[in-house]
């Protein structure tokens, strides 16, 4: 049976699983879908065309599915889609997409979103991502699986942050961070491969060694970006356990529109 506090407002049209719990003074809009065993904290607002999957935990005073902070937005029925088993803590704001992009903001599964985080319109957050308190994502930001964003960091619009990377606290990021790389500073600069994170996630010593070699080619050998990419492509077909990881590294760089941190 759905447990809805008597002071909460659930507008007609909302689709709420019978196992959902909604706390005091929370508001759920008419175009919202909430999956099984999800809990909505007190005073939270879930609005817009928002879909929440199963087993999510929304903290007190969170604002989920709000209008994009984009002056071009004209009340189009854009969306926010959130997967399963996400923790979204107090005072977090997550906005719907815009028609200037694909019209949807997405958050995958098993993410840990700490207090006061902002996820802007059209962002695409993968799985198992950690966004530390007060991390701020502008519109159209992409964050790969297992990335970690330090507290008080700011990420410029359209920036891409690769899988398994890490952005240090209080950083200002204006260009893309390749996968597996640690970045920090204002403005953020590269500081090596995220070795500890890769070990925790089961990457083999050979794969980590290959990524370290890739990092040296890109950042330490005095090569231009185009020269480095030629050698990185050769490294990616060396026949070792690190080929797949190095290939992902190179493909991310090739796809960059804003340029990578250097």
UniProtKB/Swiss-Prot annotation:
Pathway(s) of this molecule: Glycolipid biosynthesis; lipid IV(A) biosynthesis; lipid IV(A) from (3R)-3-hydroxytetradecanoyl-[acyl-carrier-protein] and UDP-N-acetyl-alpha-D-glucosamine: step 1/6
EC class name: transferase
Protein name: Acyl-[acyl-carrier-protein]--UDP-N-acetylglucosamine O-acyltransferase
Family classification: Belongs to the transferase hexapeptide repeat family. LpxA subfamily.
GO biological process, one term: lipid A biosynthetic process
Primary location: cytoplasm
GO molecular function: acyl-[acyl-carrier-protein]-UDP-N-acetylglucosamine O-acyltransferase activity
Pfam families per UniProt: Acetyltransf_11 (PF13720), Hexapep (PF00132)
Record's GO cellular component terms: cytoplasm; membrane
Cited PROSITE patterns: HEXAPEP_TRANSFERASES
InterPro entries linked: Acetyltransf_C, Acetyltransf_C_sf, Hexapep, Lipid_A_LpxA, Trimer_LpxA-like_sf
Subunit details: Homotrimer.
Source organism superkingdom: Bacteria
Keywords: Acyltransferase, Cytoplasm, Lipid A biosynthesis, Lipid biosynthesis, Lipid metabolism, Repeat, Transferase
Annotated catalysed reactions: a (3R)-hydroxyacyl-[ACP] + UDP-N-acetyl-alpha-D-glucosamine = a UDP-3-O-[(3R)-3-hydroxyacyl]-N-acetyl-alpha-D-glucosamine + holo-[ACP]
UniProt organism field: Burkholderia ambifaria (strain MC40-6)
Coiled coil, from the record: none
EC number(s) on file: 2.3.1.129
Annotated function: Involved in the biosynthesis of lipid A, a phosphorylated glycolipid that anchors the lipopolysaccharide to the outer membrane of the cell.
HAMAP family, alphabetized: LpxA
Location of this chain's protein in the cell: Cytoplasm
